[in-house]
Amino acid sequence: HQFSDYKTTWTFKCRNEYVYFTEEMVEEIREQIKNFCKLRFTEEELEYLDNIKWIKGSYVDFLRLWQPRYEDFSITTDGDRGLSIETAGTWLNTSMYEIPTLAIVNEVYFRMAYDYESLLKSFKERLLEKKWMIESGGYKLGNYSEFGLRRRLSAEAQEYAIEELNSAKTKESVFVGTSNVYLAKKHKLTPVG
């Protein structure tokens, strides 16, 4: 949409020195990126986006035509910690690949490197402790939002967090939305960010 002819490259860099990606993880990341590239917006989703005041109608029209291209990705085992991801193409395309790619990498890593069910159980326990702190007045957050997509444990964990935070009702801490537009739509929250 803006800067549509500007060519650029986006490179994934794992900054955690204790993380290593196996060949099986890299293959699963490839498969999930391929699945991402098959996604298309539905008319219902586009209509929802068109009703968000800070999203321009011309951008929604662009999204009607846009699709991610697997050909823009290079995913290999050559990088630091066993994973290299690079996208090349227009600035517009590469900028739209970053957040979904980070979410995919995190979810694949946590599902394949650990006992995912134990991680999810621990995540839920910690979240419920934080929810209790909100409801008991230990945390006074004012209006707050969730921005967990880039570094989330999983889609399942993020949705659980949104549901729990949305049900924590106090005058001092009001959950107003999420940066995950899909989950904002699904749970009738404000998309933010």
How should each PLM-predicted stretch be described?
Residues 1-193:
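Ordered alpha/beta subdomains of enzyme catalytic regions
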